[in-house]
Amino acid sequence: MLDEPVQFVHTQQLDFKKSVLRYLPAQSPQGLLNKKVLLVGLGAIGGYMADALTKIGAGIESDFVLVDKDQFLAENVSRHLLGLLYCGQFKASAIKQHLAENTFFQQKKFDVKLKTSHHLIQSFLRKTILI
């Protein structure tokens, strides 16, 4: 016999790809699936952009490259997506970690660059849909 009553738990299967496609407009039914995306700068605006782009498919089936050489500092907390937990980390790595922990997204296609090089940008200009 159990000492406590049995509690029923509701379970639900989550399909991130379906959840991304569900709310996209008809003129762009695939969102950023299969699109290579380069995001340079992960400050107050760039951090929120990375989060939003992930939620519409960036990096699910193609590359999503995050570029920022700066470290996240305590003075950034009031205006940034990241919180105190990430202070002292490089922004690109911290954003990648945040997205891995806070979305259904499997971060297999993420690449993190701490420096922007002319060569990197040139190579992406030839094959990237969104910069």
Language-model regions: role of each:
Residues 1-36:
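Glycine/serine-rich phosphate-binding loop and adjoining beta1-alpha1 elements at the start
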Residues 96-130:
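A structured beta-alpha segment of the ubiquitous adenosine-cofactor-binding alpha/beta core
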Residues 12-16, 41-46, 84-95:
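Phosphate/oxyanion-binding active-site loops and adjacent basic polyanion-contact surfaces
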Residues 24-28, 53-54, 119-122:
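Generic recognition of flexible, low-complexity loop/linker segments
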Residues 28-61, 68-73:
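Glycine-rich adenosine-cofactor-binding loop
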Residues 48-52, 75-80, 122-124:
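A short acidic (Asp/Glu
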Residues 1, 36-37, 63-65, 109, ...:
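Beta-sheet entry/capping signal
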Residues 65-105:
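Glycine-rich phosphate-binding loop and adjoining beta1-alpha1-beta2 segment
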